[in-house]
UniProtKB/Swiss-Prot annotation:
CDD domains attached to this UniProt entry: LamB_YcsF_YbgL_like
EC annotation from Swiss-Prot or TrEMBL: 3.5.2.9
Protein's name in the database: 5-oxoprolinase subunit A
Stored NCBIfam families: PRK05406.1-1, PRK05406.1-3, PRK05406.1-4, PRK05406.1-5
Amino acid sequence: MKIDLNADLGEGCANDQALLQLVSSANIACGFHAGDAQTMRQSVRWALEYGVAIGAHPSFPDRENFGRTAMQLPPETVYAQVVYQLGALAAIVQVEGGVMQHVKPHGMLYNQAAVDPLLADAIAQAVKAVDPSLRLVGLAGSELIRAGTRVGLVTRQEVFADRHYQPDGTLVPRSQPDALIESDELALSQTLAMVQQHQVQACDGSWVQVQADTVCVHGDGVQALAFARCLRDRFQQEGISVIAQ
């Protein structure tokens, strides 16, 4: 068995380099919610140094709120913004001698695309237009995954080690007090259930079926490094290879 372990990076956190020694894929902020040309370049260089797959992490234009504010933008606007962000990172990756491999939207762009078919389609079309070989990462079972499949992209269904789930398979909003998982043991047990048994226990106690191609540990989370180390150790014990897919 194998699994991809990814982290959102280039967002101004101090643990990026340490995380890159534990994960197999990096989602690099492209300037709309965090990061700039210099942080993008440094993140790319570190990812190449540690052999980590490089992906873009595009967002709504919302630096003030870290990309976590809901926005109702026309699909054509979102399309253009995603193309812009992917192009910026792709150019840096190319200059540094690497290859951009995947795209994972950030924050509210990710969450809204999980349930909004029109927004999801705009993102998928933008990714395909930039490079049809890019993998599109989205919430397992979401509209974004369906949109990517419809336009012919390779998709990767994502699950979260450090977030609680709702009964419909979406994430508990960060505005709620029980949204984040802060216990290593709980993060570990939830992740193993998703990877090995293809299910996750929702906040109401029910079980939701999920496909886990890649597991996210948020780079800005207080427990990010601890979670990543714990997961790597347990995956090794369980005979699960951590590798970008």
